[in-house]
Amino acid sequence: MIERWALISGLKGDLETYERIQKDLKKIRGDITLFVLGDMVGAKRNCNSLIDRLINPHPGDLKPHCIYGWWEDQLLAERGYRGEQKADALRLNKGEGIVKALVNAVDPYYLNWLASLEFGFVELDCGLIHGSSKDIGDKITIDTPPLILLDRLTRLGVNRLFTARSSQQFHLELTDAVVNSYIKALDGDRKQEQKVPKRGVIGIGAGAYYTLYDVGSDKTHFLNVLDQPKSNTRGFG
């Protein structure tokens, strides 16, 4: 059976969209593992129902494997789970009102669960992180320079990095290349060459836009639950 990963992010309390994604995934052939790469909470709606569904999946749901994202990090900081840190980044960018709305959107009952989530996963030769290996808020886009992409991959020691912070869907490939380095020593300068294998960075999207990854074939499919196909089955070969 084909092994596939479904990667979602940016629901921000939207239980209806999560249910639509779960329903969509039931139509897809293969052995599917569901990863939720953060931003489950947000300031625009009450997030308790979605969080409860993630913690307590309904019969027939794919079990979600969750990590925390930027919005969870800001919430936990404001709630005292990050030492003396507060939600300064959110406060600076969105204002005090949004910080208060975020705090009010999540019942304190769920904070310990959010605080228990990991920063990211490393599966096979793939890194699954909300931002990047550098920072939870690191926003990788299609315009990020290749050297920065290579740095983020190298920090984790992976060949594939799945990221969600930008909310974009993209697949950037770093083809076989050679990195030259020059070392200055007492006995003279030396040049070293290091071959870099083919690597990739994938933006998984957000909200209704999600990504399906075929583990065996290394193929990426960008999907959404806004455009529903007429067929009841989605095979992807």
Segment roles from a protein language model:
Residues 172-237:
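Acidic, His/Gly-rich catalytic cores of divalent-metal-dependent hydrolytic chemistry
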Residues 1-53, 57-60:
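N-terminal active-site segment of His-dependent metallophosphoesterases
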Residues 77-81, 140-141, 173-176, 234-235:
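Short aromatic-enriched loop/helix-cap "lid" or pocket-rim segments at secondary-structure transitions
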Residues 1-6, 121-127, 196-200:
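Beta-strand-turn-beta hairpins that frame and shape the catalytic cleft
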Residues 12-17, 42-45, 71-76, 136, ...:
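Active-site environment of divalent metal-dependent phosphoester hydrolases
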Residues 8-9, 34-39, 65-70, 129, ...:
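Active-site neighborhood of phospho(di)ester-bond hydrolases with catalytic His/Asp-centered motifs
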Residues 43-44, 50-123, 147-151:
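Active-site neighborhood of divalent metal-dependent phosphoester bond hydrolases
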Residues 28-29, 33, 103-175:
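His/acidic metal-ligating clusters that form di-metal
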